[in-house]
């Protein structure tokens, strides 16, 4: 299943800077691993915001939930999710 996910990060203004940097490094490592594994298919930064649009390819809503809740920055995110399905006019073979 494909999911379009908008993640907006809202770190507390009083968070220890070292903790924030550690969380960001852990998040980057996990995001890159999930991309290499193929479950996090695309990742785009939203210009001017501490936010991203992502495309996840996972077997179920539960798998998406499990993946998102394991992200180190999850406690500091506002997340919006849209499930996607193949459009009948699409010419791309890798749509699912």
Swiss-Prot record:
Keywords: Aromatic hydrocarbons catabolism, Isomerase. Pathway: Aromatic compound metabolism; beta-ketoadipate pathway; 5-oxo-4,5-dihydro-2-furylacetate from catechol: step 3/3. GO terms for biological process: beta-ketoadipate pathway. The keyword Zinc-finger does not apply. GO terms for molecular function: muconolactone delta-isomerase activity. It catalyses: (S)-muconolactone = (4,5-dihydro-5-oxofuran-2-yl)-acetate. Its EC number is 5.3.3.4. InterPro entries: Dimeric_a/b-barrel (IPR011008), MLI_dom (IPR026029), Muconolactone_d_Isoase (IPR003464). It holds the Pfam family MIase. Belongs to the muconolactone Delta-isomerase family. Homodecamer. This is Muconolactone Delta-isomerase. It comes from Pseudomonas aeruginosa (strain ATCC 15692 / DSM 22644 / CIP 104116 / JCM 14847 / LMG 12228 / 1C / PRS 101 / PAO1).
């Amino acid at each position: 299943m494909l999911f379009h996910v908008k993640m907006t990060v809202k770190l507390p203004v009083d968070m220890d800077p070292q903790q924030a940097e550690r969380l960001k490094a852990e998040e980057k490592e996990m995001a890159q691993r999930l991309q290499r594994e193929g479950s996090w298919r695309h990742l785009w930064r939203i210009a001017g915001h501490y936010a991203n649009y992502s495309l996840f390819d996972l077997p179920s809503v539960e798998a998406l939930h499990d993946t998102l809740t394991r992200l180190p920055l999850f406690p500091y995110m506002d997340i919006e999710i849209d499930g996607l399905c193949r459009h009948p006019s699409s010419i791309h073979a890798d749509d699912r």
